[in-house]
């Protein structure tokens, strides 16, 4: 792509540059639990031929790109959008709102709900962000990931695993709790950055009761995990539909707002740390008492629940228990 001076809507855009962030090593380390990442790495090492680190061939991929005509003084903001549909398209009515906020929009084709999450949807989103940043002046503090429905659930995974890239997430009618096998907690360093500097905007239609319930479960999870930057917005009069212009405008304004420090954050973090320590000691005690199978089961639960917060001790215990 050589279009740094091009604005407006561009279809069938082809990018050409790769980043280690979209490679298999980074994806497994950031988006899988430590034990699952260990299993994947061992399985790859056992192959007769090592697969390429990049699962996506950019020469075969197409993106839709929308660039506002007026570049903000600090550079553009960027919204990487993960769709539930297969077509690369800009949702109806969004262009004028993106203009007002100075936000570039990019979305990949063939990255909908039917596509593999780890091999396609997530690396395509990361590659989209990287290539737009190479060709346009982007304010790194205003790089966001978003999505609708199933795409919003993928966006949440990316926001959690890549808080050093994405500083906010627009969760339009799709979300999940974190801290389980599907959405594990990343390393302590990445998770701290997510807790303290990532804005999460939950935006769901007032009549979309199923996804409103999902949002409630997800927000309760964020509270349990001491995540500070959570905002809830309800779009009136609609069901399970992509956000209209007015609702999007409010959501994008909220993404840019600063996160107010929570005076209870330190106590909350201490509670989580105590729980990690207690569950780790539980595994150690089972090992000491010769209850190996129970220890393995407890280790799996520790890894699924606390992910990177239990590492590297969980990996050391896995070696001791010969967990594969």
Regions found by a protein language model. Give the residues of each.
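Alpha/beta-hydrolase-fold serine-hydrolase catalytic core, especially in secreted/extracellular enzymes
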Residues: 1-12, 60, 225-229, 246-324
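Primarily recognizes the serine-hydrolase "nucleophile elbow" in alpha/beta-hydrolase
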Residues: 87, 141-195
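Short beta-strand element of the alpha/beta-hydrolase
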Residues: 74-85
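The feature captures the conserved acid-bearing segment of alpha/beta-hydrolase catalytic domains
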Residues: 174-252
């Amino acid at each position: 792509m050589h279009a740094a001076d091009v604005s407006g809507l561009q279809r069938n855009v082809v990018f050409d540059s790769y980043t280690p962030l979209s490679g298999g090593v980074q994806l497994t380390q950031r988006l899988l639990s430590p034990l699952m990442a260990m299993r994947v790495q061992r399985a790859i090492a056992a192959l007769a031929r090592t697969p390429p680190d990049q699962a996506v061939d950019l020469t075969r991929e197409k993106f839709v790109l929308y660039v506002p005509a007026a570049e903000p003084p600090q550079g553009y903001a960027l919204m990487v959008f993960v769709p539930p549909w297969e077509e690369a398209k800009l949702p109806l009515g969004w262009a004028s709102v993106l203009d007002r906020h100075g936000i570039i929009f990019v979305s990949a084709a063939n990255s909908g709900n039917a596509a593999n999450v780890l091999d396609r949807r997530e690396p395509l989103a990361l590659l989209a962000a990287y290539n737009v940043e190479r060709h346009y002046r982007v304010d790194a503090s205003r790089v966001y990931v978003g999505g609708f429905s199933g795409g919003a659930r993928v966006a949440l995974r990316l926001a959690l695993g890549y808080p050093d890239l994405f500083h906010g997430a627009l969760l339009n009618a799709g979300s999940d709790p974190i801290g389980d096998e599907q959405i594990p907690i990343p390393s302590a360093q990445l998770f701290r950055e997510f807790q303290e500097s990532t804005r999460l905007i939950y935006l769901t239609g007032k009549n979309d009761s199923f996804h409103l319930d999902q949002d409630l479960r997800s927000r309760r999870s964020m509270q349990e995990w001491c995540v500070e930057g959570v905002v809830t917005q309800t779009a009136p009069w609609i069901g399970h539909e992509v956000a209209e212009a007015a609702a999007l405008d409010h959501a994008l304004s909220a993404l840019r707002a600063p996160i107010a420090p929570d005076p209870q954050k330190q106590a909350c973090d201490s509670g989580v740390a105590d729980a990690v320590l207690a569950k780790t000691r539980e595994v150690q005690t089972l090992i000491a008492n010769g209850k190996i199978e129970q220890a393995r089961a407890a280790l799996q639960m520790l890894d699924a629940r606390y992910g990177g917060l239990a590492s590297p001790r969980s990996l050391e215990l896995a070696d001791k228990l010969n967990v594969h």
